[in-house]
């Protein structure tokens, strides 16, 4: 968790108090290294952010200042159902998640030099936790709809299935219905909002065309000879970074 690096009470406290100074020292030190191009982090604990908003806001500002654009903080809510939350000892509820997402959106929506918002939250759900029911999926969708109505940007919604002993069976019908609703109602619309027509993304690395993957040796002049150009179609590429956007271009 990015926000608990050298935090106060990591062992003793349920919600350790974030310490902005060492995080700022680390990230600014990394950013000052000219050898470093892309700098991203990953997980953030939304409950800790919500319970310590003042310190977390200072850290968020540091992240926006130092990270490359397109950075994502993965928030593991896992479930918006209070019953699932209680039965599985989850450490973040929907209220805390909303507070954390609002803070990240407040500072992270600004676009960087490559064309993407500087820092956005990602949201994780897990299916198959104990206490889950059809009500659970309804509460998850309700939360997502509220976040959308409130105008928050979410970079991606990740839906996983729990593995291991001691968990209940997943209702396949409910799970597929929830997953399809998320893909149709949120994934596409959120990307369209984040990347409206006319958005320019710089530094895209083209990786694949017609089922063929681009390799380092293909950067040489012998691979650029016009006489060996492939057939027309869609060429796919991505920017370097965490959770990069897949870009397709006619070529």
PLM segments and residue spans:
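Conserved SAM/AdoMet-binding glycine-rich loop
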Residues: 1-122, 127-132
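Short aromatic-enriched loop/helix-cap "lid" or pocket-rim segments at secondary-structure transitions
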Residues: 10-11, 53, 135-137, 169-173
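Auxiliary Fe-S-binding modules of radical SAM enzymes
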Residues: 32-37, 108-111, 115-116, 138-141, ...
